[in-house]
């Protein structure tokens, strides 16, 4: 499924994933064009997180294909996918609490030479100054919003071409949600391709070039972000309108 004129950096075709005997994805297909921000919205249990984890290699696909930059990575290891340019910001942030902010960031650069990691960390500090101010502080003592910034920064340390964001606004106050989405838009403007999973459908579709709606492990709607925002079915099901 092609979302536009730009060639897809990520192409998922008829993807199926199981947890034991339980099927979580039922033939999902989607494309993420190079340089775009694509939002994936849907209710809890729709399969959004499972899809991201299957793309990143945390979960194994039962069938279907995942192509990245024209290469089939369906059976590639998670480590190889990171080295190829895919980074994921997991749901719930998952920072290493006892470790310092800077050590958490450096963990994200394990595939990069030290000199590149040092340049990357300065870029992260410029993007999120609060992290630099707390660079020696244990990550577990940060606020929820600061931990989300740290989680995003850690993923960026790998210098990804594709950033997978899983529920970045979860549990955050409205002001912090706005800050996180401002950062996401800035990353997209820098040319990083983003696949954003978000239950806050209005926030996600407002910034997305394209969007998909996932229901019970299947993609059921696709369109430009602004068009999905105006769609009556999306309004009723996900926007509370």
Task: Give residue spans per PLM region.
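Glycine-rich phosphate-binding loops of nucleotide-dependent enzymes
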Residues: 2-241
């Amino acid at each position: 499924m092609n979302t536009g004129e730009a060639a897809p950096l990520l192409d998922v075709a008829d993807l199926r994933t199981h947890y034991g005997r339980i099927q979580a994805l039922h033939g999902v297909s989607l494309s993420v064009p190079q340089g775009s921000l694509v939002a994936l919205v849907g209710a809890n249990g729709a399969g959004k997180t499972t899809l991201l984890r299957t793309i990143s290699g945390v979960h194994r696909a039962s069938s279907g294909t995942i192509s990245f930059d024209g290469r089939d990575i369906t059976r590639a290891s998670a480590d190889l996918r990171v080295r190829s340019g895919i980074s994921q910001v997991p749901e719930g942030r998952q920072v290493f609490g006892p470790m310092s902010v800077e050590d958490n960031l450096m963990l994200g650069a394990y595939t990069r030479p030290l000199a590149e990691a040092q340049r990357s960390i300065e870029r992260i500090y410029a993007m999120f100054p609060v992290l630099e101010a707390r660079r020696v502080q244990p990550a577990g003592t940060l606020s929820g919003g600061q931990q989300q910034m740290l989680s995003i920064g850690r993923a960026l340390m790998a210098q990804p071409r594709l950033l997978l964001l899983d529920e970045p606004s979860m549990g955050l106050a409205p002001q912090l949600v706005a800050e996180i989405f401002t950062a996401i838009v800035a990353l997209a403007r820098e040319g990083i391709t983003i696949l954003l999973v978000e239950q806050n459908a209005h926030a996600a579709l407002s910034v997305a070039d394209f969007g998909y709606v996932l229901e019970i492990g299947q993609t059921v709607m696709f369109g430009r972000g602004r068009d999905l925002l105006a769609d009556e079915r999306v309004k009723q099901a996900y926007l509370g309108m």
